[in-house]
Amino acid sequence: ALFGKAFGDWGARPVGAPSLPAVSSPPTRVVRRLDRDLTQATIVVGQVGYPRRNPDHYALSVLNYVLGGGGFTSRLVQRIREERGWAYDVHSRFSPGLEAGPFAVTLQTKNETAGEAVREVLAQLRRIRQDGITAEELQDAQAFLTGSFPLRYDTNAEVAALLTQMELHGLGIDFPARYPDLIRALTRGEINRVARQYLDPDRSVVVVVGKQAKIALPF
């Protein structure tokens, strides 16, 4: 009764989406250094990604799993954490929305190894862009993404968030049933195409926050 008294005379009206300016990655690499008295440097290497309704979303999900979204199996973790010991955590992520969201690789490392870590991130981006992924990497990514899908929505809050995304991006009420087939249908050729199309380390933005006197960047 109190709710109806307070809001009962409210009427629904159509509200259009705001018009946002188009964004794109810079024509050449941009480097931003922020000097802070910290023992560890925080590094973000990123660029403009894609909107969620882009049909390449699923191929890019597989690509990101191989590059830096697959935990200990990802290339970035293997190189930067396991082989070099430069960082405890390193990961990559696409964050698509109604418009193009960011792509970013993020890590923290000692100031003294920040330059080497940046160099390795850029090298791995070039490598996956030029050489693509292997058949084994594709199979592993498909198995994980399809197998873990139900586990991502095992709470009421997660189900509510999924339903919101389904409505917002027009995925269809049958999206949960279709998702495994969308992932399994992908080929190496499709993954390698989106790697060439969407990743360009030479047009990335590199941000390094740390004690700059101890940080030697490779450019």
Where are these regions (language model features)?
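A short, acidic, amphipathic alpha-helical segment used as a generic capping/interface helix at domain edges
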Residues: T187-R193
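Extracellular/periplasmic catalytic domains that process cell-envelope and extracellular macromolecules
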Residues: R36-L38, Y198-P201
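M16 family metallopeptidases and their MPP-like homologs
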Residues: A41-Y50, N64, V77-A185, P201-G210
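Short conserved micro-motifs at the rims of enzyme active sites and ligand-binding pockets
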Residues: N54-Y58, E116-V118, N156-A157, L217-F219
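An aromatic/glycine/proline-enriched structural segment found at the starts
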Residues: A1-R53, V208-F219
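Short beta-alpha junctions and helix-cap segments that line functional grooves
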Residues: P18-S19, V31, V62, S92, ...
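Active/ligand-binding-proximal structured segments within catalytic/core domains
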Residues: P55-L67, R75-Q78
